[in-house]
Each structure stands twice: as C-alpha cells, then as structure tokens.
Amino acid sequence: MKYTVDAASKVEVIATATLHGAMKTLFPKLSGTLEGDPAALADTAKAVVRLSMADYDSGDRMRDWKMKKELDPDKWPEAVFTLGKIEGVKRTGDRLEGKATGLLEYRGRKVTLTAEASGTLGDTEARAEARFKLNLNDVGVPPPKFLFLKVHEIVEIVVHLVAKPAQV
C-alpha cells in the first residue's frame, strides 16, 4: 500500500550543549511517500521523506535566530531521506519493528543512516517512529556556538511519521 506523509508528521532534534541540558527543536514540515506490505515489509518497504529546513521552533527566539544563520535555509531549503532497506523486521500484533537504513541528502552531502524504527501500516493510516544519532559535521552544519554555549556535534533525531493512503 502507498501512503502520503501527513501534516501531523514532525522531526525532533535533541541536542546537548556545554552548561546546558537537552534542547529540543521541532521541525514540523515534512512531505513524501511511504510504501509497504506489512506481511513482507523487508521486501516491499520504500520511502522518500523531505524535511523543510526553514520551518522550526526551539522555543527560544535567540536560538532560532542563531540556527537560521547556521542552517542557511535560503541556500539549503530541504533535507531528503530515501529508505534503502529494512532489516530484522519483527511483528507484534499490528506493530512492526526493525532497522531502517537509508541515505540522507543535505547541503550537497550524502550520509548513510541506520535507525531503530517501529510503526504500523493500516488501511486508513501508517505511523512510524525512527530514532538515530547524527554528527552535524557529516551534513556540513557547524555545531552552533553562542556566548558560553557550544552545542555538541552529535545530536539525536526522532522522526514521527503519520501518513494517509495515497490518492490514486
């Protein structure tokens, strides 16, 4: 079954910094398609997900201003993830779990990522969550610095996908 990514989807970036605990930034604008048969997910899974880099909210106006300078969304408006494979698929009721590997393209760079993923594929909706670590330097983003605050280069990414059946 083929699905279209819904507006309820979001990406959370969780960063840590010197003199500071975890800081979350929410990126709420995703688009793309998911495809798969729950009975044979390892063989049928496909996905292309696009993330707008211009729309985000950290809950701190100064941090958002600094991030805009680092991300430069006018020059680099989106990041694109293309699923390559899902391995080790386990099913518990309607819930599927496995390792998703794919290619993240951003700022002219390509990074292979592997994430712990789980979700459901139903007739009316698909939901998935994936979690992985990313080194900001790998995608050409210098870890932000502001006064005494320096963000560590390794961040945790949590992707929450909601998708509806694609219109034929």
Go through the PLM ranges and name each one:
Residues M1-V168:
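Low-complexity, acidic/polar, glycine-enriched regions of mature
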